[in-house]
Design a protein with these regions (language model features):
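Conserved SAM/SAH cofactor-binding pocket of Class I
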Residues: 1-61, 65
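Conserved short alpha-helix immediately C-terminal to the canonical SAM/SAH-binding motif I
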Residues: 38-42, 80, 107
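A short glycine-rich, Lys/Arg-flanked "PGG" loop and its adjoining helix->strand segment in the class I
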Residues: 85-97
Length: 138
């Protein structure tokens, strides 16, 4: 994958840490979105402080991010993921990759039907009680 042409979208960007990691890995076009104004401001500050150029959007994924991305990152808990997974599918390129994390053991069985409905699991990693998935569209 040529990272120069990849758009990476971080959903629920928070502090923007995943954008900083993506930039460190060589991804040039970075977008973070968060519904919380404070989080969006912090992400912008952290990107600026680390000399990372990123578009930060305070808003709703469905209406405020108009493009698609080849890589989408979402470190979110189960409740927002259950709502957002169908929207994320519309924002991910057909051959793109979605990486979700923030899924704790206690809620694993609850999220799996949402994942299995529209997504193919490429890889699952477990660290203690936490699960991370790399997914692609079915």
């Amino acid at each position: 994958m040529n990272l120069d042409s990849v758009t990476c979208l971080d959903i629920g960007t928070g502090t923007g840490i995943l954008l900083l990691v993506a930039a460190h890995l060589g991804i040039k076009h970075l977008v973070g979105i968060d519904i919380e104004e404070y989080a969006a401001k912090q992400a912008k500050i952290n990107c600026d402080n680390n000399h990372v150029v990123a578009d930060i959007i305070c808003g709703n994924l469905d209406t405020d991010f108009k493009d698609t991305a080849q890589l989408i990152l979402a470190n979110l808990t189960v409740d927002p993921l259950k709502i957002l997974l169908p929207q994320i599918g519309k924002k991910l390129d057909d051959k793109g990759i979605l990486i979700i994390s923030g899924i704790i053991d206690d809620r694993y069985d609850e999220i799996m039907p949402y994942i299995n409905k529209e997504w193919q699991i490429i890889e699952e990693r477990i660290a203690g009680p936490w699960h991370t998935f790399a997914l692609e569209k079915r």
